Swiss-Prot record:
Similarity remark: Belongs to the ketol-acid reductoisomerase family.
Organism: Bacillus cereus (strain ATCC 14579 / DSM 31 / CCUG 7414 / JCM 2152 / NBRC 15305 / NCIMB 9373 / NCTC 2599 / NRRL B-3711)
Cofactor binding annotation: Binds 2 magnesium ions per subunit.
Keywords of the record: Amino-acid biosynthesis, Branched-chain amino acid biosynthesis, Magnesium, Metal-binding, NADP, Oxidoreductase
Protein name (record): Ketol-acid reductoisomerase (NADP(+)) 2
Catalytic residues, chain numbering: 106
Residues that, per the record, bind Mg(2+) 1: 189, 193
A molecular function (GO) term: NADP binding
Binding site for Mg(2+) 2: 189, 225, 229
Length: 335
């Protein structure tokens, strides 16, 4: 595994250049501010709206996406996956020029052919492995979060060096930047989201909750046992892996882990995981998601509404009112 650190990167490669950060959401605001604090000239490219006003209030020169691309030598695309291809075709593509670098923090649109940059620009990825607020906070504390780096197209012969300079400007080389490919990052990221982190976990939590309530147990108790306490376990795993988690729980819980876990996640579950991975690798999921967006998201919206009306959500909202240490978000906005 090739990993790059501070000594391997030179942020001075960005001196005299302008970086355009396209999008000012979770990653956009963090990367733009970290770069600025590292002495890099940054402009923000967004359309008029809330993000435009926030970026302006944060002291950035804010302009249209097309103007930002014309101004910059490095263009970082930090819009949501489903918006990138449209914005690229409408405002980025015709303004690219020889020797520029087009950067991404997720490989979806490049890997699945939704964006096809011209051969005369560098195409690379710097993907911090933390949400934007943590990228910013850890940087301000003098540290950094790990990241991935990949080069898809090296027109200038310096793509990796410039990408590492960008990673250093964001603070990621302080922790370590692991070399990967657009294919590996994209396929593993989608699989992790679908099979484990989002799809797998939410299905497991709901199934456990429903099993208890259907068995006659009160929904409030089922919520505590199947969702609320999940954070306690995940935090232990996050801090020290499975061994630390198992060391920290009771022996009864640990024994139950060993003898029961494989009855829940069975060989059939793993076979289904492999089918999910194959669908991702063959582009079936990407095609489904692209078509879903083109159709106005009918399936997405229907499933989202149904999930929000699940008994688990209603019970959870009531119980969280008892938890003074939980600060509910004022507004649920996708960044």
């Amino acid at each position: 595994m090739k990993t790059y650190y501070e000594k391997d990167a030179n942020v001075e490669l960005l001196q005299g250049k302008t970086v355009a950060v396209v999008g000012y959401g979770s990653q956009g605001h963090a990367q733009a501010q970290n770069l600025r604090d590292s002495g890099v000239e940054v402009v923000v490219g967004v359309r008029p709206g809330k993000s435009y006003e926030v970026a302006k209030a944060d002291g950035f020169e804010v302009m249209s996406v097309s103007e930002a691309v014309r101004t910059a030598q490095v263009v970082q695309m930090l819009l949501p996956d489903e918006q990138q291809a449209h914005v690229y075709k409408a405002e980025v593509e015709e303004n690219l020029r020889e020797g520029q670098m087009l950067l991404f923090s997720h490989g979806f649109n490049i890997h699945f052919g939704q964006i096809n940059p011209p051969s005369y620009v560098d195409v690379a990825m710097v993907a911090p492995k933390s949400p934007g607020h943590l990228v910013r906070r850890v940087f301000q504390e003098g540290n950094g979060v790990p990241a991935l780096v990949a080069v898809h197209q090296d027109a200038t012969g310096t793509a990796l060096h410039v990408a590492l300079a960008y990673a250093k400007g964001v603070g990621c080389t302080r922790a370590g930047v692991i070399e990967t490919t657009f294919q590996e990052e994209t396929e593993t990221d989608l699989f992790g989201e679908q099979a484990v982190l989002c799809g797998g976990v939410t299905a497991l939590v709901k199934a456990g909750f429903e099993t208890l309530t259907e068995g006659g147990y009160r929904p409030e108790i089922a919520y505590f046992e199947c969702l609320h306490e999940l954070k306690l376990i995940v935090d232990l795993m996050y801090e020290g892996g499975l061994t630390t988690m198992r060391h920290s729980i009771s022996d009864t819980a640990e024994f139950g882990d060993y003898v029961t876990g494989s009855r829940i996640v069975t060989d059939e579950t793993k076979k289904e995981m492999k089918r999910v991975l194959t669908e991702i690798q063959q582009g079936e999921f990407a095609k489904k998601w692209i078509l879903e967006n083109q159709a106005g998201r009918p399936t997405y919206n229907a499933m989202k509404k149904a999930e929000q009306n699940h008994q688990l959500e209603k019970v959870g909202a009531e119980l969280r009112e008892m938890m003074s240490w939980i600060h509910a978000p004022k507004e649920l906005v996708k960044k």
